[in-house]
Regions:
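Generic structural detector for well-ordered beta-strands
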Residues: 4-8, 40-42, 52, 74-76
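Short, hydrophobic/aromatic-rich segments at coil-to-beta transitions
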Residues: 33-40, 55-63
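A short gly/proline-enriched turn/hairpin at secondary-structure junctions
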Residues: 25-30, 38-44
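Short, charged/polar surface micro-motifs in flexible loops or helix N-caps
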Residues: 24, 45-49, 55-61
Length: 129
């Protein structure tokens, strides 16, 4: 399954958000350092996983194994600026999670806003965790 968004920010900014520890920690994970092509994710609900980066093409593509599924971020420069971003998941049931992730990413790169609630007691079924 896949979903798309348009970011006013350029491909380099969007790529850095998904491909760097600091970028991921601004909208996605409590902690997400990378070493040797493996990201150590810690999420707000305390789930953890060692996620292998499968492919990384600067400003174009970022693919990783993520909690038993494959996530692929495909970036393309917009015709008049910005970034066309497509997020694909190998799990067809990921619709809500993918939309939430994309909107948090857009808020972070375009507006510098973190939409997460940062409340460990509000994680299950919360779109903003």
């Amino acid at each position: 399954m896949e979903r798309k968004i348009f970011c006013a920010s350029g491909p380099n900014d969007v790529y850095r958000a998904v491909s760097t520890s600091l970028g991921r920690e601004r909208f996605w994970a409590t902690s997400a350092p990378e070493s040797g092509g493996v990201i150590s994710f810690v999420l707000a609900d305390r789930r953890t996983a060692e996620c292998r980066v499968e492919e990384a093409v600067q400003d174009e593509l970022y693919r990783l194994q993520y909690f038993g599924r494959t996530l692929t971020f495909a970036l393309a420069a917009g015709e008049t600026g910005g970034t066309e971003l497509t997020l694909s998941s190998s799990d067809p049931a990921d619709g809500a999670e993918v939309v939430s992730l994309l909107l948090r990413l857009k808020a972070s790169v375009d507006f510098g806003v973190d939409l997460r609630n940062h409340d460990e007691t509000r994680t299950t079924s919360y779109a903003d965790s």
